[in-house]
Curated annotation (Swiss-Prot):
Gene Ontology molecular functions: cytokine activity; growth factor activity; metal ion binding; metalloendopeptidase inhibitor activity
Cysteine pairs bridged by disulfides in the record: 24-93, 26-122, 36-147, 150-197, 155-160, 168-189
Designated gene of the protein: TIMP1
Keywords noted in UniProt: Disulfide bond, Glycoprotein, Growth factor, Metal-binding, Metalloenzyme inhibitor, Metalloprotease inhibitor, Phosphoprotein, Protease inhibitor, Secreted, Signal, Zinc
Record family assignment: Belongs to the protease inhibitor I35 (TIMP) family.
Stretches of the chain forming a coiled coil according to its record: none
Post-translational modifications reported in the UniProt record: The activity of TIMP1 is dependent on the presence of disulfide bonds. N-glycosylated.
Keyword flag Metal-binding: yes
Name this protein carries in UniProt: Metalloproteinase inhibitor 1
GO biological process annotation, one example: regulation of integrin-mediated signaling pathway
Functional note: Metalloproteinase inhibitor that functions by forming one to one complexes with target metalloproteinases, such as collagenases, and irreversibly inactivates them by binding to their catalytic zinc cofactor. Acts on MMP1, MMP2, MMP3, MMP7, MMP8, MMP9, MMP10, MMP11, MMP12, MMP13 and MMP16. Does not act on MMP14. Also functions as a growth factor that regulates cell differentiation, migration and cell death and activates cellular signaling cascades via CD63 and ITGB1. Plays a role in integrin signaling.
């Protein structure tokens, strides 16, 4: 049975990674949700070619980390160069990196398993330069303030009703048909007072 252990582990990993996505039918999350639900959030460059392990059915990418926003306790004083793992096939929610620019920085949010970094096509992976200045501020320091107490509640069809005073109604998809609307690009769901969370602007205030 020993020779089959890596294959079994690989299949179990694929099921674990893809179960929430319902066979890759992913609803893009608000960036704050991506931050709070991920075990690591980093800024990094994809510097190596992808390699596929046919035994575990995993693809891995070599990355060079330039900034860590979340995951300090797990990653600690980690080296700058890491491998990020994903299912080998896109049909199994595997992430396929299409950019060939090795100097381009990406925001990568994913999960940790056995001290390895894992992402899927449902993970939040985006060019750093494509994020608004407000989103960059959110990932750098502000989104963390809403984790645990506040929740972004997606509204894609009417009627929508908040479940709690600590929820913020996310209507970008409903109003614009896109997950990259105003609330996604410029707002965070943060505590206003004990037991109450509201949308708050991340844009710098001008005098």
């Amino acid at each position: 049975m020993a020779p089959f252990a890596p294959l079994v582990s690989g299949i179990l990993l694929l099921l674990w990674l893809t179960a929430p996505s319902r066979a890759c039918t992913c609803v893009p999350p608000h960036p704050q949700t991506a931050f709070c639900s991920s075990e690591f959030v980093i800024r990094a460059k994809f510097v190596g070619t992808s390699e596929v392990n046919q035994t575990t059915l995993q693809r891995r990418y070599e990355i060079k980390m330039t900034k860590m926003f979340k995951g300090f306790s797990a990653l600690g004083d980690a080296p700058d160069t890491w491998f990020v793992y994903t299912p080998a096939m896109e049909s199994l929610c595997g992430y396929f990196h299409r950019s060939e620019n090795r100097s381009e920085e990406f925001l990568i949010a994913g999960q940790l398993l056995d001290e390895k970094l894992y992402i899927t096509t449902c993970s939040f992976v985006a060019p750093w330069n494509s994020l608004s200045s407000a989103q960059r501020q959110g990932f750098t320091k502000t989104y963390a303030a809403g984790c645990g107490e506040c929740s972004v509640f997606p509204c894609s069809s009417i009627p929508c009703k908040l479940q709690s005073d600590t929820d913020c109604l996310w209507t970008d998809q409903l109003l614009t048909g896109s997950d990259k609307g105003f609330q996604s690009r410029y707002l965070a769901c943060l505590p206003r007072e004990p037991g109450l969370c509201t949308w708050q602007s991340l844009r710098p205030r001008t005098a």
